[in-house]
């Protein structure tokens, strides 16, 4: 069975032409896929019955995620879903909605998608990392997470405005499927989301960052750094062996030079581990003057022993970076109480 959500628009054109139908039939498939959310090929009423029958007989299908659990934060701004995918795997996906009265600008509806079940990176402070790696998700499974939430919020006359690859898994370790999903989701004949509204997060796989820089895309890049030196980073990210902190930062800077997109370095602050003044100064020295941005994330509760620093310690860390000329913010917290925040996703339970 081949999911129609897997096809790039040009591939959909080739499919219908190879089946003996005119090119425009591709758009008659693509438009309802991304705006009407059909569950079966037979639901696409614009298509001739002969094409519908041939697609079904040839093993094509429309794969839609099935929601098995839902939990919503107390303020109603964050929704976490456990979705059953067409490969019978379950994955967590999160919707975060931002009120402009709180953040300024326009309202935002951001989807946090997963690219893997579990993760092989083994970050000691991350619930997903402690699951271990199970499997990569196909592009259509990534897309189905987006489609499922779009269908939900469209009922409220809202639409997805932003997409972050910050859910379960390391996107760069599933590069081909991840980038296929990105290209489909940003194609005007696909989901049509603007490239600048997408951010890909990585633990710092240099080869993946370099490859992404060559894609000629305006995708945002977030690098999970968490430490200013290799000794500490190795303790927090056991798989961080081949690429040094300096090499990762250089790869991020090269991405900025290639794409013009400012790189964000994510830094999870852990009490007594990586939050001292000395470490803040070391980080400032590394990042000063390279045009990057640091997003400080007070560690979210997981099953591990790591604790969140005091607010005064967090603000002191930020002050040191800012006074050194490093652009820095503290992440707006979303979904912590429903285990939907950074580092909290896993599939064994949902609230």
What do the predicted segments below correspond to?
Residues 150-329:
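Conserved AdoMet/S-adenosylmethionine-binding subsite of the radical SAM
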Residues 36, 100-101, 129-133, 229-230, ...:
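A short, flexible beta-alpha/helix-coil linker loop
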